[in-house]
From Swiss-Prot:
It comes from Pseudoalteromonas atlantica (strain T6c / ATCC BAA-1087). GO terms for biological process: protein modification process. Substrate binds at residues 72-79, 139-141, 152-154. PANTHER family: LIPOYLTRANSFERASE 2, MITOCHONDRIAL-RELATED, OCTANOYLTRANSFERASE. It comes from the Bacteria. Catalyzes the transfer of endogenously produced octanoic acid from octanoyl-acyl-carrier-protein onto the lipoyl domains of lipoate-dependent enzymes. Lipoyl-ACP can also act as a substrate although octanoyl-ACP is likely to be the physiological substrate. Keywords: Acyltransferase, Cytoplasm, Transferase. NCBIfam families: lipB (TIGR00214), PRK14342.1 (NF010922). This is Octanoyltransferase. Its main location: cytoplasm. Its EC number is 2.3.1.181. GO terms for cellular component: cytoplasm.
Amino acid sequence: MNDTTPVIIRQLGRQAYFPIWQAMQDFTDSRDSSSQDEIWLVEHDPVFTQGQAGKEEHLLAPGDIPVVKVDRGGQVTYHGPGQQMMYVLLNLKRHGLGVRTLVSALESCIVDTLKEYKVDAYPKADAPGVYVDNKKVCSIGLRIRRGCSFHGLALNVNMDLAPFQRINPCGYAGLEMVDCTQLGGPDSLAVAGPAIAEKLCSLLGIASVENKEGFDE
């Protein structure tokens, strides 16, 4: 990366899904070539999100958990407490990135983080995300608009995985989910969030970051 402008890493705490999705869209629509890139670390209240390719039959029994149809790639997944979301709001041209390269970097930042805990995680060529023993620990879904990315990844850290049984996760019937705590990996968002953000920046050649709490007033 040739640009020396710091990437902002924003710690947003626990938030409802819809306002953060709206903020991502507003940020992407209003940014220009001089806007700083940002990475958002956030934890969501329980919600199912249905991607652009989503099919209703994969929503088995959502019950009292709301379903939001969103503009990312992929099928249905679940977000909730104890899961680390990392949203990547990047100007792809600035970083010399193609979409596939960004997806690979997102997968690698999880694989590399878990490797430090002696957990053997891996991506799958035909099903984006990160897996351990055929169980999924991280889901990935992106949207590119005007050459800029938004959405990102969801890493199961220390959470109630039961809501995943109400759907076919990512469109795969019977796909088992797992979290980092079960694997002996990082057991809190306070540890996992900064670790994966640091790994991603390293993989993308981002040398300068600026850490912030919450949104600017």
